[in-house]
Amino acid sequence: MLLAVIALLSLAAGTTTAEIFTNTFLVRMRQPAERHVADRVALRNGFVNLGPVLDSQTEYHFVHRALPHVRSKRSVPHMRRLKVDPLVDTAIQQAGFKRVKRGYKPLSVDNLVPLYEMKNPGNPGNKDPTDPFFKYQWYLKNIGQNGGKPKLDLNVEAAWAQGVTGKNVTTAIMDDGVDYMHPDLKYNYNAKASYDFSSNDPYPYPRYTDDWFNSHGTRCAGEVAAARDNGVCGVGVAYDSKIAGIRMLDQPYMTDLIEANSMGHEPDLIDIYSASWGPTDDGKTVDGPRNATMRAIVRGVNEGRKGLGNIYVWASGDGGEEDDCNCDGYAASMWTISINSAINDGQNAHYDESCSSTLASTFSNGAKDPNTGVATTDLYGKCTTTHSGTSAAAPEAAGVFALALEANPQLTWRDIQHLTVLTSKRNSLFDAKDRFHWTMNGVGLEFNHLFGYGVLDAGAMVALAKKWKTVPPRYHCEAGSMFDTQEVTSDRSILVKIKTDACAGTEYAVNYLEHVQAVISVNATRRGDLELFLTSPMGTRSMILSRRVNDDDHRDGFTKWPFMTTHTWGEYPQGTWLLEVSFNTQTPQHGWLREWTLMLHGTKEPPYTGLSAADPHSKLAIVKKAHEERLSAI
């Protein structure tokens, strides 16, 4: 069934753009071949073998150095030459596409602070870190700095007080490189788990430019694992954890193979992969992982960490209210944890996207005062206080998850998602424009369309992780489909129902939900005016697509696009699901809903049976009670 899910999602298509082709090729052998055999095949055909794809013995990554790095047409002669080789089955020239960093702002020298400026030697009587920039790290300890709301932070001190600091956990920063010689990073750098896929060597050091463009990965790394009490910059969320650098964003175009090999690199050495990038946040792009990348992620969650599953953390996106992160196939994947941001007074940042796939939030900047940015490491051994965007939010979450994995190394990738739902806090997070309010789902869990289930609470997550019991097996139920084309107009929305028993009586039965996907094909005279809502049998209404004012598409629409919601977490899926398709516009528009498949993902058994809930007001206690009441009513 999982293979069917992968096949379905690999067909998903969104925005069509003019294709660009690179000088790299995916080459499939007729039968398994060792690396030296693939090397000979490449050499005799004028190529260089860069290595296997996802450790495969049948798929290899070839490059032709004489071809331009970027071209507008396929190189048919080179593909033909490969295909006639007796050992080669197929050869596919790699298309190039854009991936952008989230939250990067051009820097001036004024943004940067010399390494030892404001150095404050350690005070043995002070429990706080003595690092000079800790005072600026309000997201770690908010005492009201710069107009912030006291105690609106990640509550990391409660985790540190339990003796948990990220030991024996490695987080890979998939980005433009990591300055692993930075004095605040070098002792926590895991060289064995690192690689440069932009240059194909083991040294993922950033390429320096005059505009400091490639500082992004180094900044993200410091948020996770900057050392404590060394008089340098600030401190990482998990300051005793390790970081790996995976340089993969610094080439003219991204390819499926670069992404796949990055996300599948050393899955038993790397625990967490942190990504602060994605498709262009322009409010009109619909894009996501290609085939090999999808396979890499699925392999990671199923086989990584010796079968426990890798954790993929994704920045939700910086397109603001004009974009929707459910149009980003990375952030909206059920195999990733999508993280949004709030600023120091609890409101959303102006660049935050909203969507139903966001699981939780951390912190970034967005206020007028530049000192409310994220303080972290920077290039040339310097420090910054202006790291920004959801780029800054995702590594904070990775750091919190590193703390949880130290507390309980046996946590699976799904355990981390359950812990996120159960321990994140509403706190004082709010929508500055009063569009999205906190809502309770059918089993009593509060969620928000901007913030997911709230801000991560490191202390609470670590405490629950220590006593956690692994959740029951996960099943995938194709709950129903609709293939009758229906027209929707700007003055008449359509409502489509699927009634399901959630695969009851089969091996795929789902009784307690985790993720829900509505896999939809729809076209419109203006795609950006479409809105989609999914209502569960327990009455939870998720906006799975919001209006995108910049999206003028009238041709592509969405083809088998998996719109995902986490808002029904813990609910019972049996009953009638309602899909609403409408236009949000004053201009006459029309469109066609061509198909809809409802995919339910969750457990057959109650997920928290083996856990005790000491606090009757905790999320765990609330959900357990709802599940127990349901069982007693059956």
Stretch-by-stretch model annotation:
Residues E580-P588:
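Short beta-strand-plus-loop segments that form exposed binding edges in beta-rich domains
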Residues F25-L26, H61, T90-I92, T170-M174, ...:
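Structural recognition of the beta-strand scaffold that forms the well-ordered cores
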Residues H265, I270-S274, G309-N310, G329, ...:
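C-terminal subdomain of the subtilisin-like protease fold in secreted/lumenal serine endopeptidases
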Residues K83-T170, P183-N188, Y195, N200-D201, ...:
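Protease zymogen maturation seam
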Residues D175, D328-E406, Q410, H449:
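Extracellular S/T/G-rich loop segment that most often corresponds to the catalytic His/Ser-adjacent loop
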Residues L2-D55, R80-G122:
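Autoinhibitory N-terminal propeptides
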Residues G148, V156-A158, V169, D176-M181, ...:
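Subtilisin-like peptidase catalytic core
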Residues G317, F447-L530, W592-I634:
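Secreted peptidase-domain scaffold signal
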